[in-house]
Amino acid sequence: MNVNLRPAFVPCRRLAGAAQRVHQPPTASGAILLISLLLLATSLLAAPASLEQSALWTAGQEGYHTYRIPALLVTAKGSVLAFCEGRKTGSGDHGDVDLIAKRSTDGGRTWSPHSIVHEEGGDAKITIGNPCPVVDAKTGTIWLPFNRDNKAVFITSSTDDGKTWSAPRNISATTMKPDWDWVATGPGIGIQLTHGAHKGRLVIPSDHKHALASKQPEWNSHMMFSDDGGATWQISAPIQTGGNECQVIERADGSLLVNTRMQGEWQGLRGTATSTDGGATWTPIMHEKQLPCPKCQASLLRYDEKRLLFSNPFPPEPKDGKPSGARVHLTVRSSPDDGKTWPIAKRLHKGPSAYSSLARLPDGTLLCLYEGGEQRAYETLRLARFNLEWLTEAGSK
């Protein structure tokens, strides 16, 4: 038997026709379908919105009456350090107050017991506080400035990822003026500059109050900075005028933007100013009408090249046209254009809330350590862990 293994003959005209059908451009409806499928695939791949919250410190537990003034830092190795003031005998700003810290090596999911970074005088009424840490990306060293009784500036450092701390040194001689009678670092975090002539500079947002006899504006913000890796520190010109607790970021163009709590007549708004010389001098403060705020600290963080994040209490609209002074409803805001506009806002905590500190993990996850409670803002220091999808999802305003 003869078996013919050759393929069946197909006329060239039909092959040509088939080829034409295969290579015909898609119709408009086909293009729309393709785009729809791509958008669907993208949405399926996007991370779902996520928010987790828990109390990191609770008033009356772990040896202290109240925990206040949070600062949250991600180290060069990706560990998370949470700092605060442990107030032993009451919730007031002055008394027997220690600077304490907890440490996490799993992105803020679990934490070490707290340790005392610095305290003085045992049970004496000495206030150690206003933490404002910064990490030197070149060396991995963590620098932690703080205050004693708001009359002196000290700094300590860690070279082992926040496990232990050096003996503090007093740097008041180069970081205070003789006519100041009050000074504070932060509270919050400092930054290291990444652009231009001052690349590598460590910058610590700060504020001070002049003695009344000096006849200077009573309140002003300023910066502390170091150009030698933390060995020596100096201060900027004052940021005029009326600023208080502040935070600073470096913009994409290398300029600096400071956002400050306002004292006096502009208490209901935030203040902003800019610097083009690495923070040494500043424009006069402008009043930021997009960011209403009671008289309270706030947090400012760079998320990526253009996006900034901001957190603060956001009280309801006043009925009489006057800004509300209530510290309630901690809210996180997002700016897509380096702080020019703030179109996105999401409430993180409903009810009493006050100071906060934002941080970004290497994978983009966000953390916010903030003061919040049901009846009082200082019942707990709460840690929120969330992603950008939660902040930007529809209906977030």
Q: Model regions: which residues?
A:
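Asp-box/BNR beta-propeller blade signature and adjacent active/binding-site loops
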Residues: A47-K397
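Extended rod-forming repeat segments used as scaffolds/tethers
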Residues: P11, G30-A31, G92
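Bacterial N-terminal signal peptides
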Residues: G30-S43
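Low-complexity, intrinsically disordered short segments enriched for Gly/Pro and polybasic residues
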Residues: P25, S29-G30, L72
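Intrinsically disordered, low-complexity regulatory regions of eukaryotic regulatory proteins
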Residues: Q20, A28-S29, F83, L369
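Intrinsic, low-complexity polybasic segments
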Residues: L5-V22, P26-T27
